[in-house]
Amino acid sequence: MRIILLGAPGAGKGTQAQFIVEKYGIPQISTGDMLRSAVKAGTELGLKAKALMDHGKLVTDELVIALVKERIKQDDCRNGFLLDGFPRTIPQADAMKEAGINVDYVLEFDVPDELIIERIIGRRIHAPSGRVYHIKFNPPVVENKDDVTGEELTVRKDDHEDIVRKRLVEYHQQTAPLVSYYQKEAEADYTKYFGIDGTRKVSEISEELSKILD
């Protein structure tokens, strides 16, 4: 079960990724985490990435694809994986396909921009575990405390309105075209594509995902 989640920042991907990972026992692969661990481990790819980053350059698509290929060979990916934050552009999606990384499901979370802004501004996180809450839509049992540990919740630096609006503009320009790309891939039977109404309750969306993925 190899899954890509698409949708603007704040569309609810993180919450549902957590649900999918727990229910189906597949790892969530974040390109940011992969880069950091490859650099830390001093692997050949990690050293190449570090050299680029040290010179203030962006890590190339080829290098990220190579990291993804290396990561999905690991034992925890034998039943599949969930890709987080990649691909972001059509060239990246093409490169992934050319590298033989096939995807079973593309799930697109659709939410209007104004609701996304409301969602992100109210978001609270438990940094050590990555658990995500919302003061209105998905509140913790005790205000501003993590349900599991009871530790204080925090606000991400990126969760301020001006930054959110900039990220939405970037998403619509860069990543939104992937929706039609994967719809065409699904028509050609290369993958299965599902549009998810992300404005509903967390539990309703999780239920729909279960029906799709079971």
Curated annotation (Swiss-Prot):
Which domain of life, per UniProt?
Bacteria
- Which residues participate in ATP binding? 10-15, 123, 132-133, 200
Keyword terms of this UniProt record: ATP-binding, Cytoplasm, Kinase, Nucleotide biosynthesis, Nucleotide-binding, Transferase
For this chain, one GO molecular function annotation is: adenylate kinase activity
Supply the InterPro entries for this chain.
Answer: Adenyl_kin_sub (IPR006259), Adenylat/UMP-CMP_kin (IPR000850), Adenylat_kinase_CS (IPR033690), Adenylate_kinase_lid-dom (IPR007862), P-loop_NTPase (IPR027417)
> Can you state which reaction this protein catalyses?
AMP + ATP = 2 ADP
Q: Where are the stretches annotated LID?
A: 122-159
User: What's the subunit arrangement here?
Assistant: Monomer.
Give the UniProt family note.
Belongs to the adenylate kinase family.
Q: Which NCBIfam families match?
A: adk, PRK00279.1-1, PRK00279.1-2, PRK00279.1-3
Among PANTHER family, the record links this protein to:
NUCLEOTIDE KINASE
Q: What is this protein called?
A: Adenylate kinase
Species for this entry:
Photorhabdus laumondii subsp. laumondii (strain DSM 15139 / CIP 105565 / TT01) (Photorhabdus luminescens subsp. laumondii)
